Amino acid sequence: MASSLDALKARVESLLGDHLESATIDRGELTIVCSASSIAVSCQLLRDQAGFDQCIDLCGMDYSTYRDGLHDRPRFAVVLHLMSVQNNQRLRVRFFAPDDDFPVVPSLIDVWASVNWYEREAFDMYGIVFEGHPDLRRILTDYGFVGHPFRKDFPVSGHVEMRYDPTEGRVIYQPVTIEPREITPRIIREENYGG
């Protein structure tokens, strides 16, 4: 297995050349990092010349809590999982949005049509804008939803809650009414164990 991964790594490195920032084999998978400016060209090369004809997943990542010196890249990344059926191989592709405040990356819908809803989900959950996407709108949250819930700075309790009001006969929005509570851990001493 390692020899086939090494061969795939060498092939991808020669195919992508300067478009490739890094390629690592970890836990039995090859992960490559490309720049956002060259991701469309890189993905077309991977599809047309390396046989990665299917994008089986696309997701967003928020690395804002990795600011401890170990992670010196931008905050938001997009991760693709590609599959080559003819070669029986998988590949993880990662690229970072250059701007942390307003993450914009190119859409890959022209390369793989299957990324349509994946890109909409990453936009809805993380606020990553896919430039060139024909229908980039929310897919999981409500139309009037404020913010992006998978961002690390989004409050756990949210901004508003919805509930059904029987007097009005409809669903209403109201500010979150969660009271903070103090949780005290319970200590069980050894002498109190049964037995």
Swiss-Prot record:
Q: Where in the cell is it found?
A: Cell inner membrane
EC primary class: translocase
Listed GO CC annotations:
plasma membrane
The primary location reported for this protein is membrane
Record's InterPro entries?
A: NADH_DH_suC, NADH_quin_OxRdtase_su_C/D-like, NADH_UbQ_OxRdtase_30kDa_su, NADH_UbQ_OxRdtase_CS
Q: Could you cite one Gene Ontology molecular function of this protein?
A: quinone binding
Q: In its keyword annotation, does this UniProt entry include Disulfide bond?
A: no
On whether Membrane is a keyword of this UniProt record, the answer is: yes
Q: How does it sit in the bilayer?
A: Peripheral membrane protein
Q: Which UniProt keywords apply?
A: Cell inner membrane, Cell membrane, Membrane, NAD, Quinone, Translocase, Transport, Ubiquinone
Listed Pfam families? Complex1_30kDa (PF00329)
EC numbers listed for it are: 7.1.1.-
Gene3D superfamilies registered for this protein in UniProt: NADH:ubiquinone oxidoreductase, 30kDa subunit
Task: Give the catalytic activity.
Answer: a quinone + NADH + 5 H(+)(in) = a quinol + NAD(+) + 4 H(+)(out)
NCBIfam families linked to this entry: NuoC_fam, PRK06074.1-1
Similarity field: Belongs to the complex I 30 kDa subunit family.
> What role does this protein play?
NDH-1 shuttles electrons from NADH, via FMN and iron-sulfur (Fe-S) centers, to quinones in the respiratory chain. The immediate electron acceptor for the enzyme in this species is believed to be ubiquinone. Couples the redox reaction to proton translocation (for every two electrons transferred, four hydrogen ions are translocated across the cytoplasmic membrane), and thus conserves the redox energy in a proton gradient.
Question: Assembly and interactions?
Answer: NDH-1 is composed of 14 different subunits. Subunits NuoB, C, D, E, F, and G constitute the peripheral sector of the complex.
HAMAP family reported for this sequence: NDH1_NuoC
Q: What is this protein called?
A: NADH-quinone oxidoreductase subunit C
Recorded source organism is Laribacter hongkongensis (strain HLHK9)
Q: Which gene encodes it?
A: nuoC
